[in-house]
Amino acid sequence: MSATDATQVISATTTTVKRFKGALIGCGFFSRNHLHAWRDIDGAEIVALCDADSERLRAAGQAFGIERLYRDAAAMLSAEQLDFVDIATTAPSHRSLVELAAQAGVAAICQKPFALTLADARAMVAACERAGVPLMVHENFRWQPAIQAVGRALRDGAIGTPFWGRVSFRSAFDVFSGQPYLARNERFIVEDLGIHILDIARFLFGDVTRLAAATSRVNSAIAGEDVATILLTHESGVTSVVDCSYASRQARELFPQTLVEVDGAEGTLRLSADYRLEIHNRDGTRTATAAPPPLAWASVPWEAIQASVVNIQRHWIACLRNGGEPQTSGRDNLKTLALVEATYLSAREGRTVELKSLEAEAPAVTSTSSGAVRR
């Protein structure tokens, strides 16, 4: 071996893979899943935390061994050398925080719902595009192993061309004890949960041209709607039904499982309880289990959701590394957020809503950039 060859071998074996450094903003209920997931992902490290609540901030830092703690996001962005921020706060703070990150030239992940209005969401997308930094919405439900398995089967043509589908989430699980603010929200199930299920419908069947929706409130102790049924017409020709309920008291609680039915020109697909995936076509019927993998930190009944957090955050790091656009980029998520707005409009006015009617650019709402955040 020549000296040149030896040098090339040494260089190849000592090459290190870039480790992306991030900070998490918002140390509340769901952020622990983010932090656990970051630990499981090669090439990523959370080096700082930020939260307006000093006690919660300190507890998260101690639990995950993170020493650099901030109560002000602007101060953190100024002091730290970051590749990205993971914004795990509630929606009212999203625009100011995303704009802060864009001004600092830092890529951003933003929890869902992306924004309270389409105008704010468009402003965030524009800010990041002007700054040339990636923006991804943490729309994790489509990244559940079972939903990914359904998507692969449809792409592989297992049942031919789909023409009808249903995506269903029905439960009576107490989501309010961990997130009490949900009981006070005037817009509840569509904005908090339905946004996930609508995004799954987009993931499986493509973009939507029009929808009609009905909502109701069964639980008188909460402010918002807890039942929604939405009929969607997709550009692909598929007609789908999205139905969501937190008022369905079943013999067996399936939270947080999402069930899927799809009829195609050559067969049917069913994702039923316990992640049982059944595909029937001309070759017969086959079944498989699409259960989430065991994670050391996972907790019952959240395993599938927690697995989806790992998957979407791993996808984010891959996009940062190769320069690709995230599946649920800010610009892509405008389409999911538009479905939420169209659902509320349809339910309120009792009519079918054409999605094109929401595509016109709305004037951006003025927002101040406050660094104090809370989840």
From Swiss-Prot:
Record SUPFAM superfamilies: Glyceraldehyde-3-phosphate dehydrogenase-like, C-terminal domain, NAD(P)-binding Rossmann-fold domains
PANTHER family assigned: CONSERVED EXPRESSED OXIDOREDUCTASE (EUROFUNG), OXIDOREDUCTASE
Binding of Mg(2+), residues: W38, R39, I41, A44
Family: Belongs to the Gfo/Idh/MocA family.
E.C. number(s) listed in UniProt: 1.1.1.420
Residues involved in NAD(+) binding: F29, F30, D51, S93, Q111, K112, N140, Q179, P180, Y181
Protein name as it appears in the record: D-apiose dehydrogenase
Lineage: Bacteria, Pseudomonadati, Pseudomonadota, Betaproteobacteria, Burkholderiales
Reactions catalysed according to its record: D-apiofuranose + NAD(+) = D-apionolactone + NADH + H(+)
Top enzyme class: oxidoreductase
Task of the protein: Involved in catabolism of D-apiose. Catalyzes oxidation of D-apiose to D-apionolactone.
Gene3D superfamilies: Dihydrodipicolinate Reductase, domain 2, NAD(P)-binding Rossmann-like Domain
Keyword NAD annotated: yes
Binding site for substrate: K112, Q179, D192, H196, Y246
Keywords: Carbohydrate metabolism, Magnesium, Metal-binding, NAD, Nucleotide-binding, Oxidoreductase
GO function term, MF aspect, one: metal ion binding
Metabolic or biological pathway: Carbohydrate metabolism
Keyword tRNA processing: no
